[in-house]
């Protein structure tokens, strides 16, 4: 029998309780455990420990959700720090940072990786659609570039799904999972804005880029309308083009449909997760997991989104 310290959402001194299981469970694994005559969700915090109590009194883990990917150790370390810093029980800190779907007692389906579409070698050898069919030709050109999701392709041509299905039946289309998104300005459906930075903006963006790959905070100072947004959009584009993740944190009041539309237009072909309290619980949980798995490259959210586990974060914009 193996013993584990498990974080549960209860107001204990540290919110960590000891449970047993027939095999060692990886830290970060979601489990169901008995607590005060009911079943609650827990997160494995420490595995294979030596208990400091009579083992006959230790209850067993009821269910371990082994098909779900464990929360990463870096995330556990961050929540442990948060708990110490704010003198708050670890278990309650952990569950404050989780989306609703991971607090419930049922299994969660893990999201599938996004598909990226492109013309294969046989497709590239075909004659492109005539220019007079401008939407169809635009879709063909986008597939020549490759690295675009179906959502992004539908912004180029609303009939993308049907046309791609037709071309796939002819053997002209290939799909890949988790390909690095290619940021591009494309027929007005711009993921890379046509806005040209002025000298001061370019200097600020260049300075930020010198710190890529290391930790360095920057403060953008400027009056309303001075173009700060374009500076951090430019920096975000550079990080995303490397295939790394960007976390974009906003106050709830600023997270408007207009802003989300602006971001979607700018980064149309980038897999994006949006995390805020107004989202449906199921969608928010799936977006959280997509971010954790590295499937979502751009993560937009309110302050609580800072606790989203990101395996390859390259830039945080606040």
Locate predicted features.
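Accessory, non-ATPase domains that flank or precede helicase/AAA+ motor cores in DNA-metabolism machines
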Residues: 1-318
């Amino acid at each position: 029998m193996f013993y584990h310290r498990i974080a549960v959402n209860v107001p204990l001194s540290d919110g960590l309780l000891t449970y047993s299981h027939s095999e060692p469970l990886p830290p970060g694994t979601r489990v169901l455990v008995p607590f005060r005559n009911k079943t609650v969700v827990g997160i494995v915090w420490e595995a294979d420990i030596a208990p400091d109590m009579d083992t006959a009194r230790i209850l067993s883990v009821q269910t371990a959700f082994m098909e779900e990917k464990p929360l990463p150790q870096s995330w556990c370390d961050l929540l442990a720090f948060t708990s110490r810093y704010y003198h708050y029980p670890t278990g309650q800190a952990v569950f404050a940072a989780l989306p609703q779907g991971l607090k419930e007692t049922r299994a969660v389906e893990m999201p599938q990786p996004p598909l990226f579409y492109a013309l294969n070698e046989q497709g590239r050898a075909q004659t492109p659609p005539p220019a007079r069919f401008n939407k169809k030709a635009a879709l063909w050109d986008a597939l020549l570039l490759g690295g675009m999701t179906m959502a992004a392709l539908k912004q180029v041509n609303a009939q993308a799904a049907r046309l791609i299905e037709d071309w796939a039946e002819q053997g002209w289309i290939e799909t890949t999972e988790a390909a690095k998104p290619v940021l591009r300005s494309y027929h007005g459906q711009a993921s890379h804005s046509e806005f040209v930075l002025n000298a001061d903006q370019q200097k600020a963006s260049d300075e930020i880029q010198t710190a890529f790959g290391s930790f360095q905070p920057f403060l953008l100072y400027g009056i309303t309308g001075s173009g700060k947004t374009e500076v951090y959009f430019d920096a975000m584009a550079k990080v995303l083009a490397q295939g790394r993740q960007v976390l974009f944190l906003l106050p709830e009041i600023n997270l408007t449909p207009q802003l989300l539309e602006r971001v979607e237009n700018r980064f149309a072909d980038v897999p994006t997760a949006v995390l805020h309290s107004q989202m449906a619980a199921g969608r928010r949980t799936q977006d959280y997991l997509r971010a954790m798995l590295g499937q979502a490259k751009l993560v937009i959210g309110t302050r609580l989104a800072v606790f989203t586990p990101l395996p390859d974060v390259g830039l945080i914009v606040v």
